[in-house]
Amino acid sequence: MGYEKIIRTMRSLVDGLELDVLEVVPEGEIKGIFQIHHGMSEYKERYLPFMEYLAANGYVAAIHDCRGHGKSVKIKEDLGYLYRGGARALVEDAHQLTRELKEKWPSLPLILFGHSMGSMVVRMYTKKYDDELAMLIVCGSPSKNPAVGVGENIARIQKKFRGDRYKSKILEAASFGSFAGKFKGEKSRFSWCCSDPEVVRAYEQSPLCGFTFSIDGYEALFQLMRECYGTEGWICKNPALQVLFCRRSRRSLYWRSAQVRAGSTAYAPGRIQKYQRKIISGDAS
């Protein structure tokens, strides 16, 4: 099946920030819409092969560079800076794209997929907007970090003296140091991202990948973790929503098996009727 690739912009309703959007639209009969939210320190075109696969199988695939990523920045130095929108802006931007997609294809079911940081965005999204979705896919969700409060305190102190645009190596080390240490001795400091060395090389060489978050970005990240693991504020207008939690068995940044069970069971506690957990063997990202 052929497809059309569309690149456009979307002006955020939160603050007017221009967000870059990519859509891959099948030429034949369309079965549904598959909306993707990417992870931290990457960009939308990394998902293009997957989107082309979806389009070849009859699904509209859509993704935006979330604020502070890819082309959704005012200047290149703003990579990792979320323009003080916080976790709320990430969620509202994603919902805005949902509404635009459903206006184009009002009769089609919409599946929302989030990877890594994006998995926390889509989980927080469903606190308010679960009735927009036919299915939610939570992929590679970071484990709940008990040291979030410590990170928030470091961010607060550094912001006072450095400002919220400061790229904090201390916060980066505190957030990911123990994980990166498990890959010590590998050829690349990004070896954790994939078992395929070509993918790792492309990630390492891209100026749009692997950048350090600003203090503003880390504050949003910590807020996402608090919100998506919290038990309060779930409206749950769609208890029939199907939810799939999935992770690679050897991606140790993400949930261990017990954490997958605990995280999915705690999801919208007592209200979601149908969810599934899947741990995929292997170590490719």
Task: Give, region by region, the residue ranges found by the protein language model.
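Alpha/beta-hydrolase active-site loop
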Residues: L82-K102
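Conserved alpha/beta-hydrolase
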Residues: R46-E77
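Short beta-strand element of the alpha/beta-hydrolase
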Residues: I30-G39
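Alpha/beta-hydrolase-fold enzymes
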Residues: V122-L208
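N-terminal cap/lid segment of alpha/beta-hydrolase-fold proteins
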Residues: M1-G28
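Alpha/beta-hydrolase fold nucleophile elbow
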Residues: W105-S116
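Active-site glycine-rich loops that stabilize anionic/oxyanionic intermediates
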Residues: H38-E42, S116-M117, S249
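Short beta-strand/loop motif that positions the catalytic acidic residue
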Residues: F245-R247
